[in-house]
Amino acid sequence: VPATGSPRRPDGLSETTAAALLRVSTATISSQLRKAGLNETFIAGVRPGDPSRRLLGRARTLRYLPLREDVFARIGNGMNAQKRAVESLSPGDVLVIDCRGELGAGTIGDILALRAQLRGAAGIVTDGGLRDTEAVRELDIPIFYGGSHASVLGRRHVPMDIDLPVSCGGTLVNPGDVLVGDGDGVIVIPPDLVDEIARLSLEQERQEAFILSKIRAGASVDGWYPMDAAARAQYREATDTDIEKASTP
């Protein structure tokens, strides 16, 4: 949870779903997405500016292409795609920047990050470099980034497209996907699955809290992780909950 304030609930998410997603870990969400048949949902290689801050929001996408000087001269200056993307952000939006994993230039810095914050954005995710890293990390907006680089984006990139499917950290992100971020990184949830994934993830963490209580009390992991029939019976008796669907793999 952020050090100050609370993330705004993105439009279209129920209070119950948003509360669950702000509580559960990306690791747990990953387990439930895998059970749903989705294995490629974690944005690899991005780190949080502040691991204590949670991210929750809907994706707005920005795509950078490799630098070609004549193209940059035509479309890269002034109110380019990067600046238009920032100016179009609404409360609950997460700006997802596809930089092809290129770390040889900055992709956003403190001025545009501040503007995103003031427009109510829920966060920024870039698989490229971050400029003005210390200043950005002090802002009141979650930021996940691939690395730090002092150079402007024009050293390696042309800002090209807004609100198209992109690849960020090797993961496909569609505009409108739900993003959750924590100390491990950022995970992508398809909107049509988000309510069920949130519910099952919350139940999985309840189960794991029960398992942890047994391990702390001296129990072996054998029979408890994963839970066998006897352990499941104990959990049902203690919680009056059907655990079959959400149980830890």
Task: Tell what function each PLM region has.
Residues 2-175, 189-249:
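Feature captures the catalytic cores and cofactor-binding loops of soluble hydro-lyases/lyases
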Residues 179:
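C-terminal binding/interaction regions
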Residues 182:
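Beta-strand-loop-alpha-helix segment that lines the small-molecule cofactor/substrate pocket
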Residues 185-187:
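Channel- or pocket-lining gating/hinge segments that regulate access to a cavity or pore
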